[in-house]
Amino acid sequence: MARHDEAKAGGLFDRIGNFVVRWPLIVIGCWIAVAAALTLLLPTLQAQAAKREQAPLPPGAPSMVLQKEMSAAFQEKIETSALLLVLLTNENGLGPADEAVYRKLIENLRADTQDKISVQDFLAVPEMKELLASKDNKAWNLPITFAGDAASPETQAAFKRVAAIVKQTVAGTSLTVHLSGPIATVADLTELGEKDVRIIEIGTAVSVLIILILVYRNLVTMLVPLATIGASVVTAQGTLSGLAEFGLAVNMQAIVFMSAVMIGAGTDYAVFLISRYHDYVRHGEKSDMAVKKALMSIGKVITASAATVAVTFLAMVFTKLEVFSAVGPAIAVAITVSLLGAVTLLPAILTLTGRRGWIKPRRDLTSRMWRRSGVRIVRRSTIHLVGSLIVLVALAGCTLLIRFNYDDLKTVPQHVESVKGYEAMNRHFPMNAMTPMVLFIKSPRDLRTPGALADIEMMSREIAELPNIVMVRGLTRPNGEPLKETKVSFQAGEVGGKLDEATTLLEEHGGELDQLTGGAHQLADALAQIRNEINGAVASSSGIVNTLQAMMDLMGGDKTIRQLENASQYVGRMRALGDNLSGTVTDAEQIATWASPMVNALNSSPVCNSDPACRTSRAQLAAIVQAQDDGLLRSIRALAVTLQQTQEYQTLARTVSTLDGQLKQVVSTLKAVDGLPTKLAQMQQGANALADGSAALAAGVQELVDQVKKMGSGLNEAADFLLGIKRDADKPSMAGFNIPPQIFSRDEFKKGAQIFLSADGHAARYFVQSALNPATTEAMDQVNDILRVADSARPNTELEDATIGLAGVPTALRDIRDYYNSDMKFIVIATIVIVFLILVILLRALVAPIYLIGSVLISYLSALGIGTLVFQLILGQEMHWSLPGLSFILLVAIGADYNMLLISRIRDESPHGIRIGVIRTVGSTGGVITSAGLIFAASMFGLVGASINTMAQAGFTIGIGIVLDTFLVRTVTVPALTTMIGRANWWPSELGRDPSTPPTKADRWLRRVKGHRRKAPIPAPKPPHTKVVRNTNGHASKAATKSVPNGKPADLAEGNGEYLIDHLRRHSLPLFGYAAMPAYDVVDGVSKPNGDGAHIGKEPVDHLLGHSLPLFGLAGLPSYDRWDDTSIGEPAVGHAGSKPDAKLST
């Protein structure tokens, strides 16, 4: 055992070792108490994982934000719910008997008052039948919504009760039931996960047990790591369960993965510690001291290894996807618990079993093989390096063929009930019929306008024309096609139809148009006659007015009735006046009767409006009509009747009295109708103008009829043209779009607007159905195409200031892909930085950590390439999208573990020469690294038996990566590269300096300071080979301390003259002082079960490399100037007696 790798007194592990060795039972008791308390007081980790469903995306993902905005715009409550899809099928066709079973099922579900469920029955809502009944009439879909999260225990319990109701109702009928949907998938995954955990743990434990039997060949030694791992797993699960109570996310994937990682890592730590324990026991240490020294020497390596894995996984808490952020902290906690178990519980168990001799080391069977391997690598380092890199690069190149799978259903076994349900649904319903994408349009403008809806329709039409788009449904196209009523071509056809009807009517009523012409002429003649009568009436009326005026003058003022009595000569004239008034009023009333409709007609006549004469006549006729309506003509008629009734035998007083009343009424009316004579004159003039205008009107009517007949042929041509457009309306390019404002008030529009338009009219949503599988990369790329087309349709429209988004399964998976790419970059950078820093701290160098990081990266890519070959090219399975991230962290971290063990040992051996150090390190650590690698690989290969394909792919890829790393990278690539680089590996530390350069004063002063500050609570253990040497009779005995020329012991000489001793170590024949060189390999292969130095077998020649006086066995070696500056098998240039073909004697 190398002196530089020995247990150093002081420090954390010295104190832990003292405590554990002194009170092992207390340590074991504490572990048992903690594990039991966590198990009894907290729920199981599986129960904690079942309480919440893993969120596929973070809340700030674009698709999640869009969903919230859409729910807010349409005033839909975002409630936690779980969907169950009950698919009822009958391959012979659904009939009345099946409908009766369906109705019975609805009744039974609604009778279930224990569970809060909502059933979408298409029989109760006929409009839903188009979506829930298949076109082939062989399947009905019955969606059932549960209140609560799909993964919560309450919801899962409700699901089991509802599933029982469904199966009992359908049993014995012609219907076949399939249960699918998110809640059914979660139930299946939970059941599979629980089974997988047990199977994986048992299978992994058995495989690890077999490997431990082969490694230790001791039943107790084999069981010690398993006991430590078992206690660590129980404690870690309890710890995670407690942390889950405070919000730590855990899921079944994390649990399964954690179990495999803990078994692998915990066994590795145990193998490292037990192997070092066995080394110390072989070299004569008592069991307790061997436990303590093993912990002191290997504790820092185990801690660095665990820190690498734990910190790397803990960094995943900063990732966005929960598949990483949930697994990372769980693995970090599990690795931390494994480390605590390895440095406390395992040493305590080793202390108890070692005191009783139950874990004695067996003879090492592989050291010689690994030593020869190291010799070959050092001798031909370039060939080994190039050969190993060719293999690694070739395998890594296969990653260029990798294709990722985003469909989680493909990762679940096909025999699972929910998967069968999805397959049956895809057989009977179009792809994405139940889960279309949603195009969401939000605008500051009101979209309930013809222009805005036309722009939305234009956008929808362009989207529908994209490849692999089945249909786009929305307000303007509820069935996937624009409503025919909104097509401009349809509307033009409707106009054409009306014009065609008008043309037919014109043709059918041509004779009536001729009658209209004759009627116009007759009207003109009648109006001419009326004019003559009006002129006569006006003349009489003028006389009446004058007479009445005179009568008013005679009877008005201060005249009395007595004066009228003397005017009896007027009686005859009064009777004549009454007769004239009666005739005139009769004529005026007749004129007013027919003039009223004529005035209305002339008011709406454009011909009359443009003719001044007609307008004047129309005004006069309106005055006559107004006189009749006001009662003026009735008053005059009453006066005429009174005058006509005057009799000779009547007394003048009676007549005058009657006349007095009538005259007052007439006078009162005349006062009300002021200017009647003027109006009568105007009426006479109007009648003349009307008669003259009627002749012109008759001529205009004649011309109008002629023009209408000519229009008939033109209307017929227009009708044929518009009807032709209607016939081509089915072509989208010919259809056009127009929605009249009147349609907004229809019930059909209002009903559709509730689904596709928000209440305030500022948001709209359209459903986009794709023909692609939503979980494919093609569907994700299609999302970008849809958004690009939608965005290109916005400029210069009502939607130019609107925001457009797309929600749906492909959109969410596209977000997952984007977040995965971002998380993967973070994981790679964080892992490389963390591993590099830990290697730098451990090795105190910069060069070696750089190429060690490169080695684990190419090892990871090679493992991923092998996984691609096996699963994708051979088994035909696409790799799950989460595999590269999870496998990267674990392979890099585990590779760093073995790097730390290997390179730290080489560094400790480097003072004796890099090449000798590589040979010794490969020989001494080859078996340990191989055992640890096989154990960890076996734990990962245990995941191959998992039901979930994702875990199987991860287990195989990580397992084969560990095997590749163990047998190729750590045993060939890294040793060869280390040999070629030489002392530059350790730059800029002291070990990286040229040994021929004498130390500076500063170097010597620093060494003296370090020597004074060195603390040693216990004596530093001396190299085992200085304690045991071989006698000629084969028995072990204590060796005396050898002295250097100054007479001081070797260790003192080294401390006081380090520079001298360094040169003595590199002497080709160190006859003295070389005893200070640690060469623990002297006793390799010696078994000392009783600790008395007894051994079996003969010393191999190659073991003499570490002998203090190698007088024999080295004849086959070429001569060296310096052991660490010339590769074995390559003699120094110009050295006498060197032979190019010289070989190391084995």
From Swiss-Prot:
SUPFAM superfamilies referenced in this protein's UniProt entry, alphabetically: Multidrug efflux transporter AcrB transmembrane domain
Q: How does it sit in the membrane?
A: Multi-pass membrane protein
Instruction: Print the keywords alphabetically.
Output: Cell membrane, Membrane, Transmembrane, Transmembrane helix, Transport
Q: Where are the transmembrane segments?
A: 25-45, 206-226, 254-274, 298-318, 330-350, 382-402, 826-846, 850-870, 883-903, 928-948, 949-969
* Parts forming coiled coils: none
Query: What Gene Ontology cellular component terms go with this record?
Result: cytosol; peptidoglycan-based cell wall; plasma membrane
Q: Which PROSITE patterns match?
A: SSD (PS50156)
Q: What is the superkingdom listed in this entry's lineage?
A: Bacteria
Name where it's found.
Cell membrane
Which InterPro entries does UniProt cross-reference here?
A: MMPL_dom, MmpL_fam, Mycobact_MmpL, SSD
One family name in Pfam for this protein: MMPL
Q: Would you identify the family this protein belongs to, as annotated?
A: Belongs to the resistance-nodulation-cell division (RND) (TC 2.A.6) family. MmpL subfamily.
Name of this chain's protein:
Probable transport protein MmpL12
- What gene codes for this chain? mmpL12
